Regions:
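Type III/flagellar secretion export determinants
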Residues: 1-206
Length: 206
């Protein structure tokens, strides 16, 4: 049998620019078990690593359906598993055409470290991407079927830039039992209402 478990928790206090203190606590647990009754052949493929922000759930998952998208920005579209409902890619529309054209407009799809890419925009050095950073007003969440929504419009106030490792190999197993992605690391974001959610590096099999 193959078994995998993961627990994540975060707690702390954050002081906002207007002097308010927000106490936060967040956690989730994941588990996977498969009884292997016959030999399983896993398709080896390249992993692409975009950041995913979970607006309506605590952790990212993948569906057994796919969409076409040039995740590695090589001019050829790749077949990728769809994010489960409630999760979105964190995106930056660099050419302002109201579309996400390829993986260069996501975080981590090319470098493999989306949190490090995002940290380059932390102008005030407070370890958050928030209203004190000029990129905040340009960041969006994105799903192919829904298009772009500004992070401020969906209630995201700040994204913490220091993730912890949360390795989980079996994300979105398809009907053949093949993993469609790997969870690498997790951090948190603060909502405008004072609650928190998760941001994760999710490696997709292309």
């Amino acid at each position: 049998a193959e078994r995998e478990q993961l627990r994540f928790s975060a707690s702390g206090s954050v002081q906002t620019a207007d002097g308010k203190t927000i106490d936060l606590k967040l956690g989730f647990a994941m588990s996977y078990q498969q009884l292997q009754l016959s030999e399983r052949i896993t398709r080896e493929s390249a992993l692409k690593d975009p950041l995913v922000i979970n607006l309506e759930k605590q952790f990212a998952d993948l569906q057994d359906t796919r969409f076409e998208f040039d995740i590695d920005s090589d001019g050829t579209k790749d077949s990728l598993a769809n994010l489960s409902q409630g999760s979105y890619f964190l995106a930056l529309d660099k050419n302002n055409n109201q579309e996400i054209d390829n993986g260069s407009e996501l975080f981590g799809a090319q470098s493999g470290n989306g949190f490090a890419e995002l940290a380059q925009y932390d102008e005030d050095g407070n370890s958050f991407i928030d209203e004190g950073d000029s990129i905040y007003a340009k960041l969006s969440v994105w799903r192919p079927e829904k298009g772009l929504m500004a992070i401020a419009d969906v209630g995201v106030g700040a994204i913490y830039l220091h993730p912890v490792e949360t390795q989980f190999q079996n994300i979105g197993n398809n009907s053949e039992g093949e993993s469609q992605g790997v969870l690498r690391s997790s951090s948190i974001y603060l909502k405008e209402d004072g609650t928190a959610g998760t941001v994760q590096q999710l490696d997709l099999r292309a």
